[in-house]
Structure formats: C-alpha cells, structure tokens
Amino acid sequence: MCEKRYDDILLISDLDGTLIPRYEMISEENIRALNAFTAAGGVFAAATGRTPESALPYLDGITVNAPSIFFNGAMLKDLSKNQVLETRTLDGDIWRTFAARVLYQFPRACVEVYTAEHCHVLTPEANDDPRLAGEFYNVDHTNLKTVEDETWLKFFICDAPINLSFVERLAEELGIDKCSTSFYSEANYLEFVPPHTSKGAMAEVLKAMPAYAGRRVIACGDYGNDAELLRMADIGIAPEDASEEAKAAADRIAPPCREPIVPWILREIF
C-alpha cells in the first residue's frame, strides 16, 4: 500500500479550543498526527490570537514548517527562523485616547496592549484575566504613559459582556470602529486589531507565498475570530462545540475539541 502524501496541503489551525482543549496542553495524538502529516509532505501553520512567546510551549515537539499567524492576524512570523515577515499596526493618537477612556470608564476590566515583543497590562494585577498566569504569557504590568510611544498590534479588553457592549459604543463614539477591526474571541474578550486584519486575511498572504503556491488550504477554528479563516480555506473545519458563527463558516464539523482533531482530519478529509 502506498503511503498517503500531503504535498499539496497547507493546514492552518487555531490553537485554543481547536487544537488544544481549554487550560490543557496539546494531546499526544494531535502531536503524532501533525508530525506524520508534515513528514509526508504536508505544511502546517498555527493561527492564534496569542503572542509567539505564549504559543511556543503549546507547539513544543511539533513540526511547524510554515510561517504562523499571531495576534489574530496582526503578525506573520517564521518561528523556525525567529523572523517576523509581516505586521499590521494600530496607528494614531486615537488609540491612546481610547485606551485612556477605557481605563477610566471600566475600572474592573483587564486592559492589555500587545506589541511585537510583549503583552503590556495597563490595569492592576487584581484585574488580571486568569489566563495570564496559567498560559505562558510574559506579562509586563505597566501604565499607559509607558507604552504610548510603542507600536501597538492589538488592544484587548477582558470584562463582563455587558460592560464590553458599552466599550463597543465608546469605540463608535470615538471613531475607533472606522480605523480597526474588532471581534470577540470569547464572550468576555473584546479585541481590536488594525483595519482589514484577521487570521483569514493573513492566511491569504501566507497562501500567496511562492513556497506554498498551489497548495489547498485546510483550516480549523472554533470562534468568531476564526470565521474569515474558515471561509477563505478550501475546506474549513470547526469542532462540534465551536461557536455558531464558526460552525456557520465551516464546510465540515469535527468531533468536540476534547477529541483530537488532526487524526480525524487525516482520516476523514483526505
């Protein structure tokens, strides 16, 4: 029997809630399947809202042989060469004004500014989202003035959903909605990235690179921030326990996240 080959496939997967169950590490079954996939000619890239640094521990032992997408589409980075290939940035003083208003009007929120190298938390440690301590984030607790002159890639607010609805109104009031893309990555996570930025948009950049020309894109994701990625793919896949928005954007529904998704893909899709 001939060994199955994947020389024409580019597999792009979200991490949290797709490849990795919440608050856990990647399963051995997924690791083995991914490495078998790349050994047989497949190309694999991660697509995550995480920083490269916080994603790396979850990718330990996996062959990531294509540039990966970070900050929900604001960065494309080749991890093997530690080289940033593309970034999208939040430009203008309006972002500093918006951040100051959010800090003043939502004192219980966890407010984070992401630069290429760091996650800067602008709020007291008492407000920290639990994921910061448990998911390999290198956190810099600081203040807005300290990061005003940095180059921002992503602005993130963790708060109760009702409060985030008022943050959205504030964004409209200040015109932030006209100079950004915003989305929920969880019910209590509201994120702002540069205009026309998404995992899907950066995946188009990756797909167009000469090294991957002609490969079919198989993409996996579980939440609204994955929807464009799922739609741009030749085959978009969402776990059974994904959000309704993600499932509506997908072509195929995989078993729930706790069941390893990559063996299922290799068995059911190819």
Show where each model-derived region lies.
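Short hydrophobic/aromatic-enriched beta-strand-loop microsegments
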Residues: 65-71, 88, 132-134, 236-241, ...
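Conserved acidic, metal-coordinating active-site core of Asp-based
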Residues: 108-220, 224-225, 229
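Short, structured coil segments at secondary-structure junctions
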Residues: 62-64, 72, 80, 174-178, ...
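Mg2+-dependent phosphoryl-transfer enzymes with acidic/Ser/Thr/Gly-rich catalytic loops
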Residues: 2-10, 27, 191-270
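Active-site metal-binding loops of divalent metal-dependent hydrolases
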Residues: 15, 50, 221-223
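Short active-site oxyanion
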Residues: 41-45, 64-66, 153-154, 215-216, ...
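Hydrophobic packing residues within well-ordered alpha-helices of enzyme cores
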Residues: 55-59, 167, 246, 262
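Active-site phosphate-binding/coordination module
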Residues: 23-128
